[in-house]
Amino acid sequence: MRVIFAGTPPFAAAALEALVAAGHEIVLVLTQPDRPAGRGMKLAASAVKQAALAHGLPVYQPTTLKTPEAQARLADCAADVMVVAAYGLILPQAVLDLPRLGCLNIHASLLPRWRGAAPIQRAILAGDCETGITIMQMAAGLDTGAMLAKTVVPIADADTAATLHDALAVAGAAAIVSALSAYDTLVPQTQDEREASYAAKLSKEEARLDWQQPAEALARAVRAFNPVPGAWTLLAGAPFKILRAEAAPQGEADAPPGTVLRADPAGIVVACGGGALVLHEIQAAGSKRMTAAAFLAGRALSAGTRLGA
């Protein structure tokens, strides 16, 4: 097929690579404009742009698709289909109507659950045991289009947003190739609005741990916010991130939430609203990530210390 591909991050780059490998003719690659990145804040190309250039594919980086110029550029491609994966720009109806077979989206959840910007993190936060990929026809609403195919991906107890992202990227790449090869046989299914839920965008403040919450919920938060924006709390008024943690076994002593119960090389144990959380990897402000043992080797932290203030 003649394909316009629209995407930006590594999740999307995996799908682009799979489409190229499957022999589809990628007539144009849309991706976000280069952005400042790194300590030097130099302009950096998106993962999709890098993949496209490596294959000699034409790249187009508009700031909007609402202009006549942008829409004319897409129309000139005479594409059979547009494949969209974490692109980051709104597709107006005029663009959705351009490809002969419409626009297909690779969404990282089992729709209609977790429509929206952060489906991977929301699935972990909610304690879901599985998530997946939905290939859907794009419509004007937020992830409301008819579903063409689904792939289930289990969520392991140790999965972070990063590891689950990688598993979903592989699944999404395979799913879109399969969907295009079987397109004529796929039957669109309308989403059940009664089962819809929304994966709101993450914020740094949301990633601040509330020690009043149960330990199991806080352990999920640490996994969900790893690597970005990173679960965090305060120690002596200074923020530090918690990168790996687990709910403690039963039997830890009772204490006000946020109180350090024990601090040794095996971990920093903190009382929660229910149970206790064991911190295994942390990152203090201005420092690199380190194990609890390494952190304690350079700083005294005694039982009774309060976190969060």
Curated annotation (Swiss-Prot):
One of its GO terms (molecular function) is methionyl-tRNA formyltransferase activity. It catalyses: L-methionyl-tRNA(fMet) + (6R)-10-formyltetrahydrofolate = N-formyl-L-methionyl-tRNA(fMet) + (6S)-5,6,7,8-tetrahydrofolate + H(+). It comes from the Bacteria. It is an enzyme of class 2 (transferase). Pfam families: Formyl_trans_C, Formyl_trans_N. (6S)-5,6,7,8-tetrahydrofolate binds at S109, L110, L111, P112. InterPro entries: Fmt, Formyl_trans_C, Formyl_trans_C_sf, Formyl_transf_N, Formyl_transf_N_sf, Formyl_transferase-like_C_sf, GART_AS, Met-tRNA-FMT_C. Gene3D superfamilies: Formyl transferase, C-terminal domain, Formyl transferase, N-terminal domain. One of its GO terms (cellular component) is cytosol. HAMAP family: Formyl_trans. Belongs to the Fmt family. Attaches a formyl group to the free amino group of methionyl-tRNA(fMet). The formyl group appears to play a dual role in the initiator identity of N-formylmethionyl-tRNA by promoting its recognition by IF2 and preventing the misappropriation of this tRNA by the elongation apparatus. This is Methionyl-tRNA formyltransferase. The lineage of its organism: Bacteria, Pseudomonadati, Pseudomonadota, Betaproteobacteria, Nitrosomonadales.
